Amino acid sequence: MDPGPAGDEVSLAPQQETAEQDVETTLRPRRLSEFVGQARVREQLELVLHGALNRGDQPDHVLFSGPPGLGKTSLAMIIAAELGASIRVTSGPALERPGDLAAMLSNLAEGDVLFIDEIHRIARPAEEMLYLAMEDYRVDIVVGKGPGATSIPLEIAPFTLVGATTRSGALTGPLRDRFGFTAHMEFYEPAELELVVRRSAGILGVDLRDEGAVEIARRSRGTPRIANRLLRRVRDFAEVRADGAVTLDVARAALEVYDVDEHGLDRLDRAVLGALVRSFNGGPVGVSTLAVAVGEEPTTVEEVCEPYLVRAGMLARTPRGRVATVAAWQHLGLVPPQHAPGEATRSLFADEV
């Protein structure tokens, strides 16, 4: 797969590069009052947290689900800030053995927040240990092997677990049921993203004009992390090739350089649609086969590209596989066949290949 000219392409996959993490941290809201968008989630979360604080109780465990880049990690940090607590951060893949989890839990102080990103990827033995920790604030440490093995209970400090997942369907029922509050994060509307871009521009000292903010927000795929990333790339363009002001013309020119089209699709999105249309005549085709065609992992296609393509009405998930809609054919400048669906199937309950 040709990556294109060096420096002329930006990936919109909402995955952070290490060099940009400090900037991302700077742009994160610190309190619920600073968090833009997700109004219903914010209202519900405020009630959960402040209700527990007023009673002097430990808040219920919290689960956030939704596509990457919508603010799940930011909300986890905000929860700790609202509670005046410390936060420990880990991820599901890092918890391979029960001992890994036991060591982390035993180091928690009373009232701490434990944030587990990608919690659906936690190993089953560690997950089973987590059940008891969430309910009774203790874990059982198994000493020895075979018939002579003994279980030693270990008390841990009361804590609040915050889990984040991009695949809520991959969570086991017992784990999901132990969260007292669950919230699904929705894609942002352009007007909300415009507020995100304006706030970030103020923090970064960017000379952002009204039309420039609207254009960046419109092409940000409904995702704040992408909006912030595009703002930084447009800022670079404005400082190097213009007078530093992010106007409409500057934003459009910059986004063209970075290969972000008018619908917010990047190279990978168009590669997925192109393969679906040109190699498989619009589908249906399984996600694994489609991923091979574009040289990516199936999880990347499924978790990064598909949610927005479905929302944009360019891709349909059907029981037989992925299908390009009329909008996808038209976006690629092609005439759609008669069998192409008019809009994406958005059911969350359809069997997927």
UniProtKB/Swiss-Prot annotation:
One of its GO terms (molecular function) is four-way junction helicase activity. Residues 1-25 are annotated as: Disordered. One of its GO terms (biological process) is DNA recombination. Gene3D superfamilies: 1.10.8.60, P-loop containing nucleotide triphosphate hydrolases (3.40.50.300), Winged helix-like DNA-binding domain superfamily/Winged helix DNA-binding domain (1.10.10.10). ATP binds at L27, R28, G69, K72, T73, S74, E135, D136, Y137, R178, Y188, R225. It holds the Pfam family AAA_lid_4. GO terms for cellular component: cytoplasm; Holliday junction resolvase complex. Keywords: ATP-binding, Cytoplasm, DNA damage, DNA recombination, DNA repair, DNA-binding, Hydrolase, Nucleotide-binding. It comes from the Bacteria. DNA binds at R317, R322. Residues 1-188 are annotated as: Large ATPase domain (RuvB-L). Residues 189-259 are annotated as: Small ATPAse domain (RuvB-S). It is found in: Cytoplasm. Residues 262-353 are annotated as: Head domain (RuvB-H). The keyword Cytoplasm applies. It is an enzyme of class 3 (hydrolase). The RuvA-RuvB-RuvC complex processes Holliday junction (HJ) DNA during genetic recombination and DNA repair, while the RuvA-RuvB complex plays an important role in the rescue of blocked DNA replication forks via replication fork reversal (RFR). RuvA specifically binds to HJ cruciform DNA, conferring on it an open structure. The RuvB hexamer acts as an ATP-dependent pump, pulling dsDNA into and through the RuvAB complex. RuvB forms 2 homohexamers on either side of HJ DNA bound by 1 or 2 RuvA tetramers; 4 subunits per hexamer contact DNA at a time. HAMAP family: DNA_HJ_migration_RuvB (MF_00016). Homohexamer. Forms an RuvA(8)-RuvB(12)-Holliday junction (HJ) complex. HJ DNA is sandwiched between 2 RuvA tetramers; dsDNA enters through RuvA and exits via RuvB. An RuvB hexamer assembles on each DNA strand where it exits the tetramer. Each RuvB hexamer is contacted by two RuvA subunits (via domain III) on 2 adjacent RuvB subunits; this complex drives branch migration. In the full resolvosome a probable DNA-RuvA(4)-RuvB(12)-RuvC(2) complex forms which resolves the HJ. Belongs to the RuvB family. This is Holliday junction branch migration complex subunit RuvB. It comes from Saccharopolyspora erythraea (strain ATCC 11635 / DSM 40517 / JCM 4748 / NBRC 13426 / NCIMB 8594 / NRRL 2338).
